[in-house]
Amino acid sequence: MTVMHSLRSRILLARVAVQLPLAEAGDRLPGLVIGGADVAVLTTGGAVDRRRDLKILRDLERYLGQRLLLAVDTPEIVADVRVLFPGERDRSRPHQWALLGQVVQERGQIVEPDGAFQFLAVPGTPLGSPLLRAALENQPPLRQDSVPWFAAGGLDAGSVQALAETGVRRVWLTEGGTVEEVEQIDEILRWAWGEDPAYEDYLGFAVRA
């Protein structure tokens, strides 16, 4: 597994999350990591072959775990990071340092986030949606007391550029994306972070978290 004390720092510093089926991760993920992915959300679609899926995850942890956070969508596979999609109620964590993320559907989940979750995924489209505005206003991305959140959707470099111009600093590519797309998106967000007035103070805070 990843180093326990670094999990919170790593989610605070993450810019690009990619979502893809766990079964495809062995082939696709190495390239996406090179492209700049910081988090991989590995989905099972509710059909878990625990022995097979655990082996895939452990192999990924062994080869890529120091370069990105590996998240799963089910409590049936023990992982340092898990995402609760709508309808999932099990908030169990395998250890006290494990991270839980929530895919939000309501404004209240952003304005008054549940303390059980260490990060959120907010629908990133359409641009200027009520949920996106609520996240930008109530959880400014590089404010130290904000819950880190990702604007999620089938995003490309153009839409990420538009999001970054509104203040978004993290994105979650629900369709995974190509290596080239991830490279472009990572560059857009790297520049946006560097130009953000809050960046220097936030960086120091996040590294020490």
Residues of each region from the PLM?
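N-terminal amphipathic alpha-helix/helix-capping segment at the start of soluble metabolic enzymes
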Residues: 1-27, 208
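Surface-exposed amphipathic alpha-helices with a cationic face
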Residues: 5-8, 54-65, 90-98, 132-144, ...
